[in-house]
Amino acid sequence: NLYQFKNMIQCTVPS
């Protein structure tokens, strides 16, 4: 679940 959460944030916040 944590992996998915991090992935969602990365998709929302393109570094």
From Swiss-Prot:
Cofactor: Ca(2+)
Cofactor note: Binds 1 Ca(2+) ion.
GO molecular function terms noted in the UniProt entry: metal ion binding; phospholipase A2 activity
Source organism, top-level taxon: Eukaryota
Record field: catalytic activity: a 1,2-diacyl-sn-glycero-3-phosphocholine + H2O = a 1-acyl-sn-glycero-3-phosphocholine + a fatty acid + H(+)
Enzyme class: hydrolase
Enzyme Commission no: 3.1.1.4
Tissues in which the protein is found: Expressed by the venom gland.
Location(s) in or outside the cell: Secreted
Biological-process GO terms, alphabetical: lipid catabolic process
Predominant cellular place of this UniProt entry's protein: secreted
Assigned keywords, A-Z: Calcium, Disulfide bond, Hydrolase, Lipid degradation, Lipid metabolism, Metal-binding, Secreted
An example Gene Ontology CC term for this record: extracellular region
Similarity comment: Belongs to the phospholipase A2 family. Group I subfamily.
Known function: PLA2 catalyzes the calcium-dependent hydrolysis of the 2-acyl groups in 3-sn-phosphoglycerides.
Protein name: Phospholipase A2 3
Provenance organism: Naja naja
